[in-house]
Amino acid sequence: SIDQKLALIASRGNIKGLKGFCPVALRDSRLLVDARPEFSSSYKSMNYQFASLENKLKFDREPAKYAPAAGGSDIVTLVDKQDDQEGTLDFASWYKGRLYLFSSKTNMNVFMKTPALYVGVE
Protein backbone atom coordinates (compact mmCIF):
# COMPACT_ATOMS: atom_id res chain seq x y z
CA SER A 1 0.00 0.00 0.00
CA ILE A 2 1.01 3.63 -0.33
CA ASP A 3 1.09 4.01 3.47
CA GLN A 4 3.50 1.06 3.75
CA LYS A 5 5.76 2.56 1.08
CA LEU A 6 5.76 5.95 2.82
CA ALA A 7 6.62 4.27 6.14
CA LEU A 8 9.51 2.39 4.51
CA ILE A 9 10.82 5.61 2.94
CA ALA A 10 10.50 7.44 6.28
CA SER A 11 12.36 4.63 8.05
CA ARG A 12 15.50 5.59 6.12
CA GLY A 13 15.71 8.80 8.15
CA ASN A 14 17.55 11.83 6.81
CA ILE A 15 19.21 10.03 3.89
CA LYS A 16 18.71 12.14 0.76
CA GLY A 17 18.11 11.12 -2.84
CA LEU A 18 16.78 7.62 -3.52
CA LYS A 19 17.51 6.52 0.07
CA GLY A 20 19.24 3.31 -0.99
CA PHE A 21 16.48 2.05 -3.26
CA CYS A 22 16.97 0.83 -6.83
CA PRO A 23 15.90 3.45 -9.42
CA VAL A 24 15.02 0.78 -12.00
CA ALA A 25 12.66 -1.06 -9.64
CA LEU A 26 11.14 2.30 -8.72
CA ARG A 27 10.57 3.32 -12.35
CA ASP A 28 9.50 -0.01 -13.83
CA SER A 29 7.49 -1.52 -10.96
CA ARG A 30 7.03 1.32 -8.44
CA LEU A 31 8.66 -0.99 -5.90
CA LEU A 32 11.05 -0.02 -3.11
CA VAL A 33 13.82 -2.58 -3.55
CA ASP A 34 17.15 -2.21 -1.77
CA ALA A 35 20.07 -1.40 -4.05
CA ARG A 36 23.36 -3.26 -3.66
CA PRO A 37 26.76 -1.55 -3.89
CA GLU A 38 28.20 -4.24 -6.18
CA PHE A 39 25.78 -3.13 -8.92
CA SER A 40 26.56 0.53 -9.59
CA SER A 41 26.85 2.99 -12.47
CA SER A 42 27.59 6.68 -12.91
CA TYR A 43 25.49 9.09 -14.92
CA LYS A 44 25.99 12.88 -15.13
CA SER A 45 28.44 12.83 -12.20
CA MET A 46 25.99 10.94 -9.98
CA ASN A 47 26.45 7.38 -8.72
CA TYR A 48 23.52 4.99 -8.73
CA GLN A 49 23.19 1.54 -7.21
CA PHE A 50 20.84 -1.23 -8.30
CA ALA A 51 19.16 -4.32 -6.90
CA SER A 52 20.56 -6.63 -9.58
CA LEU A 53 22.90 -6.85 -12.56
CA GLU A 54 19.83 -6.93 -14.82
CA ASN A 55 18.65 -3.59 -13.42
CA LYS A 56 22.14 -2.09 -13.76
CA LEU A 57 22.22 -3.10 -17.43
CA LYS A 58 18.74 -1.60 -18.01
CA PHE A 59 19.96 1.66 -16.47
CA ASP A 60 23.16 1.62 -18.53
CA ARG A 61 21.10 1.31 -21.75
CA GLU A 62 18.72 4.19 -20.88
CA PRO A 63 20.04 6.21 -17.92
CA ALA A 64 17.86 9.26 -18.61
CA LYS A 65 14.77 7.06 -18.28
CA TYR A 66 15.73 5.86 -14.80
CA ALA A 67 17.72 8.66 -13.17
CA PRO A 68 15.65 11.22 -11.27
CA ALA A 69 15.09 14.48 -13.15
CA ALA A 70 17.83 17.08 -12.60
CA GLY A 71 20.05 14.40 -11.07
CA GLY A 72 17.83 14.28 -8.01
CA SER A 73 18.13 17.99 -7.27
CA ASP A 74 15.04 19.92 -6.17
CA ILE A 75 13.97 21.41 -9.50
CA VAL A 76 11.85 24.12 -7.84
CA THR A 77 14.81 25.60 -5.94
CA LEU A 78 16.97 25.23 -9.07
CA VAL A 79 14.56 27.27 -11.19
CA ASP A 80 13.13 29.72 -8.66
CA LYS A 81 16.25 30.44 -6.58
CA GLN A 82 19.13 29.15 -8.75
CA ASP A 83 20.03 27.06 -5.69
CA ASP A 84 21.03 23.41 -6.01
CA GLN A 85 19.48 21.45 -3.14
CA GLU A 86 19.39 17.68 -3.13
CA GLY A 87 15.89 16.25 -3.17
CA THR A 88 14.67 13.21 -1.31
CA LEU A 89 12.28 10.35 -1.89
CA ASP A 90 10.33 11.68 1.12
CA PHE A 91 9.03 14.41 -1.20
CA ALA A 92 8.80 12.85 -4.65
CA SER A 93 6.45 12.92 -7.58
CA TRP A 94 6.11 11.07 -10.86
CA TYR A 95 5.37 13.28 -13.84
CA LYS A 96 5.22 11.93 -17.40
CA GLY A 97 7.29 8.90 -16.44
CA ARG A 98 10.08 10.85 -14.69
CA LEU A 99 10.77 10.86 -10.99
CA TYR A 100 11.20 14.31 -9.44
CA LEU A 101 12.69 14.70 -5.96
CA PHE A 102 12.16 17.76 -3.77
CA SER A 103 13.70 19.11 -0.59
CA SER A 104 10.32 19.95 0.96
CA LYS A 105 6.62 19.17 0.72
CA THR A 106 6.03 22.83 -0.19
CA ASN A 107 8.28 22.58 -3.25
CA MET A 108 6.67 19.30 -4.28
CA ASN A 109 3.24 20.95 -4.16
CA VAL A 110 4.48 23.98 -6.14
CA PHE A 111 5.74 21.62 -8.84
CA MET A 112 2.50 19.63 -8.95
CA LYS A 113 0.45 22.82 -9.46
CA THR A 114 2.60 24.13 -12.34
CA PRO A 115 4.91 21.38 -13.64
CA ALA A 116 5.33 23.06 -17.04
CA LEU A 117 7.43 25.78 -15.38
CA TYR A 118 9.98 23.19 -14.27
CA VAL A 119 9.95 20.23 -16.66
CA GLY A 120 12.95 19.98 -18.96
CA VAL A 121 15.38 21.75 -16.65
CA GLU A 122 18.41 19.54 -16.25
Positions of predicted regions on the chain:
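Charged, low-complexity intrinsically disordered segments
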Residues: 1-122
